[in-house]
Regions:
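Beta->alpha turn/N-cap motifs
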Residues: 45-46, 63-68, 87-88, 141, ...
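Short, hydrophobic alpha-helical packing/hinge segments within bilobed ligand-binding/sensory domains
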Residues: 48-50, 144-146, 163
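A late-sequence structural motif
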Residues: 23, 175-213
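Phosphate- and divalent-cation-binding pockets in alpha/beta enzyme and binding domains
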Residues: 22-23, 52, 118-122, 165-166
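C-terminal regulatory
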Residues: 74-81, 85-153, 168-179, 209-213
Length: 213
């Protein structure tokens, strides 16, 4: 039987929504089950999670930042491929002749929030459209991205691992196969972790390195 302290310990972890929707919970679930802890997940864009670690709100952060911050360590977790997807119906309606700059000016996309620049960077880099030239919903949920796309309400960038069943069934289609975004994730955390902090950190690293490329 696990030995529990008299009161739960709160662990604050900064993560992006895509990681939360895919592999983070399976990674930390064994530690949650074997220790009396309360997990507080601080959701930010993958480029901004590191700020929660810098200001002391979290003991660890999953981030795309490849350089360590003062007083912390980092470990490479792996790579995530992002695909631009939509429902077949949406694709036929907005992109009957393929995706292009003119069609993107009418087709609604999705971003996490107004600070999330992954979608706008992708559209600008590959189609030459600046921020504000395309309609864009703000939805702070990776699962809701997929739901909106499946209902034909928008197109979006999502991790390939999150939508394997939908791609296999044809419920979602990859609408821009020539351009894939690959993001490398890193785990930043306090130095010299002990106890359950180290257990959570080790679990995140081991699971991520097993499931990510």
């Amino acid at each position: 039987m696990p030995h529990f302290p008299p009161t739960p310990l709160t662990l604050h972890i900064a993560t992006n929504a895509d990681t939360l929707a895919t592999w983070l919970i399976p990674a930390i679930a064994p530690v949650i089950k074997s220790h009396l802890v309360e997990i507080n997940l601080l959701i930010e864009g993958e480029a901004r999670t590191i700020n929660r670690l810098k200001d002391g709100q979290a003991f660890g952060a999953i981030s795309v930042q490849a350089t360590p911050i003062k007083g912390c360590q980092l470990t490479r977790l792996g790579c995530v491929d992002y695909l631009l997807v939509a429902s077949a119906e949406f694709s036929r309606h907005y992109f009957p002749n393929g995706i292009c700059a003119d069609s993107l000016k009418k087709a609604p996309g999705i971003a996490f929030d107004h600070k999330d620049n992954m979608h706008t960077r992708y559209i600008q880099q590959h189609f030459g459209l600046a921020q504000g030239e395309c309609p864009l919903h703000a939805v702070r949920s990776s699962d809701a991205f997929v739901t909106m796309a499946k209902h034909g309400a928008a197109y979006c960038l999502v991790p390939k691992t999150q939508i394997k069943p939908e791609l296999a069934s044809g419920e979602l289609v990859h609408i821009c196969k020539e351009h894939i975004i690959t993001e490398t994730l890193y785990w930043h955390h306090w130095m010299l972790l002990k106890g359950v902090y180290k257990d959570v950190s080790d679990a995140i690293i081991a699971h991520a390195q097993a499931v990510l490329d």
